[in-house]
Amino acid sequence: ESSETQVERLEPASVYIVPVRQHSGDAGTIVVKTGDYVRKGDPLTKSSGRRDLPVSAPTSGTIAKIGLHTAPHQSGLEDLEITITPDGKDEWRERHPIEDFRTRSPEDLLCIIHSAGIAGMGGAGFPADQKIAGAVGKTHILIINGSECEPYITCDDRLMRERAEEIVEGIRILKY
């Protein structure tokens, strides 16, 4: 049963096809070109407003193609996507972790969440910073919904078991 099986790390793919629009709203502006080298976390698109989110490289490698490809959506329609040929190193770009989130204002944290391209996991994929911003200063109760939407889906269950400390830290940030 999957609820008793630990989450496993997949082997790296031989190619990554990254949808430019992974959220509700418009696609961001593409900031790379074919032949560019990117590191994991490098921006592939730039946000032009609050309703679109930037998309980042999932690994290090070379931009092989920018063009239409069948979207990972039940419609089967084509959408703009960026193809990356990985170099096998999976190198991160330079990162600047925040040691103590309480040294930042809630507005700064919302900007960081937006810049990271974090979208909700629901079907609409709303930008997470927008969902959070609508509740700042107005909410006294935070409900963390860990229920799966189907009886045989267990990915959230496994993540809650295996990554509980990170989840609690995220809750602390949301409370802040």
Indicate where each model-derived feature is located:
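N-terminal, Lys/Arg-enriched amphipathic/low-complexity engagement segments
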Residues: 1-31, 83
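Intrinsically disordered, low-complexity boundary segments flanking structured domains
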Residues: 2-7, 41, 68-71, 130
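Generic hydrophobic-segment detector
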Residues: 15, 25, 31, 51, ...
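Active-site-adjacent bridging/hinge elements
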Residues: 15, 35-38, 141-148
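Short histidine-centered loop motifs in beta-beta connectors
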Residues: 28-37, 41
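Generic structural signal for buried aliphatic residues
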Residues: 38-44, 63-64
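Cationic-aromatic interfacial patches
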Residues: 48
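Iron-sulfur-associated redox domains of electron-transfer enzymes in respiratory
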Residues: 52-176
